[in-house]
Amino acid sequence: MSTPSPQLLVAAAQQTLGMGKRKCPPRATCLHLAGEVLAVARGLKPAVLYDCNSAGVLALQSYLEELQGLGFLEPGLHILEIGENNFIVSPEYACQHLEQTLLGTVAFVDVSRSQPHPSVRSVDQLPDLKSLIADVITRFRGLKKDVSQGVSYTRLHSSDWNLCTVFGILLGYPVSYTFDLNREDDNCLTMTPLRVFTARISWLPGQPSILLYSFSVPESLFPALKNFLSAWEKELRTRFRAQNAFADLSISSEVVTLPAVAL
């Protein structure tokens, strides 16, 4: 796969994602999006959440097909719609990640307001989530069998899901928040020190780095979660070494305290 000029990547995004009354994404956003999509295709993350504007499934399908036509992507990426949110997914890598999640490689932090402080949960303590993950794996396995029909699309009904938890898993985080859906408007993270992890990679010369991951864990639980975080970093560095599209992987963390945390 070749890397088209930045001008072509920007044009592909603006011509497909900025149609009609939607505002065209700015140049920097277009290039960052292309980098994120390429990172998904190269197995550096299972999925990316599209949040540049209100473009829907058809526009995203056109965008990915345009990138394929430029020789930027191989066929195989998938669009997953959950509620009003759209993800660009690598079914192959997402399956691998979800299967590992069922084996306990991802930790969950319960931040329900009813608790005095956050606490760690395992996937085995969340049976409804286990069932949901298994269902998504089954759907993705079916998709991997045929990539010849253009960019495929799946819509999942999510009325009773904890979207915060599901999104964290799909985005490849080693730790995902969960909470009581009956009190979804609040949590116990207010004024709680959080360790925020970020992973960045370099791509186009002269352009800002690509933000690959950004997630947080309560600082008080960092010792209990360290093995999950170390395993995630090791796996990411292994996958990074196996590709040649990006350079300069940088993983860092800082502790912040916020008056309120929206999930």
From Swiss-Prot:
Annotated family: Belongs to the UPF0739 family.
Lineage top rank: taxon: Eukaryota
Protein name listed in UniProt: UPF0739 protein C1orf74 homolog
Pfam families linked: DUF4504
